[in-house]
């Protein structure tokens, strides 16, 4: 019996007590982790929109405005690098006629125009005049 008693005492010493604790539902943790992983994605999209998409959209609108305002007699530059003077603007089919040399005219799409060089030259001349006035005003003082 003494062996049995020793075994019972050993078993009593080896027992583990289990305590009940509150169990947090796993769904709450997964929902929170899902939202926290979504926040960086939303921030990346916002940065992408403000740095890339929005400026591109404004450039596209400026280009459409430029193309729609082309008039006869203006010097233009096409996307293929050809300079010419607009001789005819066709509103209904989006084409314009450009004279690239004396009696040499080509027909191109309005969307092929990348710059109206006559306007660019006017702006450059105005800036040059303002600069000259400031310099001459400074010398007079």
Swiss-Prot record:
Any matching Pfam family: YajC
Organism: Rickettsia conorii (strain ATCC VR-613 / Malish 7)
Record function comment: The SecYEG-SecDF-YajC-YidC holo-translocon (HTL) protein secretase/insertase is a supercomplex required for protein secretion, insertion of proteins into membranes, and assembly of membrane protein complexes. While the SecYEG complex is essential for assembly of a number of proteins and complexes, the SecDF-YajC-YidC subcomplex facilitates these functions.
Keyword terms of this UniProt record: Cell inner membrane, Cell membrane, Membrane, Protein transport, Translocation, Transmembrane, Transmembrane helix, Transport
Localisation per UniProt entry: Cell inner membrane
Summary of subunit composition and partner proteins: Part of the SecDF-YidC-YajC translocase complex. The SecDF-YidC-YajC translocase forms a supercomplex with SecYEG, called the holo-translocon (HTL).
Listed transmembrane segments: 33-53
Membrane topology of the entry: Single-pass membrane protein
Protein name, entry field: Sec translocon accessory complex subunit YajC
Matches recorded under InterPro entries: Preprotein_translocase_YajC (IPR003849)
Cellular component, GO annotation: plasma membrane
Domain of life: Bacteria
GO annotation (BP), single: protein transport
PANTHER family, per the entry: SEC TRANSLOCON ACCESSORY COMPLEX SUBUNIT YAJC
UniProt keyword Transport present: yes
Family to which this protein belongs: Belongs to the YajC family.
